[in-house]
């Protein structure tokens, strides 16, 4: 299965009539492996900050997490495995696997829990596959 298929069929899937605003699978260096049509472009320093937060949980909490210049307030995640952010009526979930970052961005009416479920389910599957 291609990385694009994972994005199109597993991340951008419909859940209770809603779907993510955008999604992507990236390498730990920020290289895009696959993305939805309107996924924002991460800046290199944003990826560096995100990877540092996975290594040093809480690193982004004082400043917030930036994605394509948009600031997200970091909310409780799973140290070293999942970072979650909130911005207005939407937010972001990033799941780290051995080789990739699985990213989902949502807006209302999708809920944070629905975004978490979609992103983390695929991330957990990739971890099980050694990815």
UniProtKB/Swiss-Prot annotation:
Assigned keywords, A-Z: Actin-binding, Allergen, Cytoplasm, Cytoskeleton, Disulfide bond, Phosphoprotein
Primary location recorded for the protein, binned into one broad class: cytoplasm
Gene Ontology terms, MF aspect: actin monomer binding
SUPFAM superfamilies from the UniProt entry: Profilin (actin-binding protein) (SSF55770)
Cystine connections: 13-115
UniProt short sequence motif Involved in PIP2 interaction, positions renumbered to this chain: 81-97
Location in or out of the cell: Cytoplasm, Cytoskeleton
Residue positions where Phosphothreonine is found in the record: 111
Additional comment: The variability of the residues taking part of IgE-binding epitopes might be responsible of the difference in cross-reactivity among olive pollen cultivars, and between distantly related pollen species, leading to a variable range of allergy reactions among atopic patients.
Protein name as catalogued: Profilin-1
Gene: PRO1
């Amino acid at each position: 299965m291609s990385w694009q298929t994972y994005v199109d069929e597993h991340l951008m899937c419909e859940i209770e009539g809603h779907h993510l605003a955008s999604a992507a699978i990236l390498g730990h260096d920020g290289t895009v492996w696959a993305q939805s049509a309107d996924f924002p472009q991460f800046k290199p320093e944003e990826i560096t900050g995100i990877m540092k937060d996975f290594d040093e949980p809480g690193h982004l909490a004082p400043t917030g997490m930036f994605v394509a210049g948009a600031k997200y307030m970091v909310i409780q995640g799973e140290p070293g495995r999942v970072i979650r952010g909130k911005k207005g009526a939407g937010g972001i979930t990033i799941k780290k696997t051995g080789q990739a970052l699985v990213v989902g961005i949502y807006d209302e009416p999708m809920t944070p829990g629905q975004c978490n479920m979609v992103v983390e389910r695929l991330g957990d599957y990739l971890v099980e596959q050694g990815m």
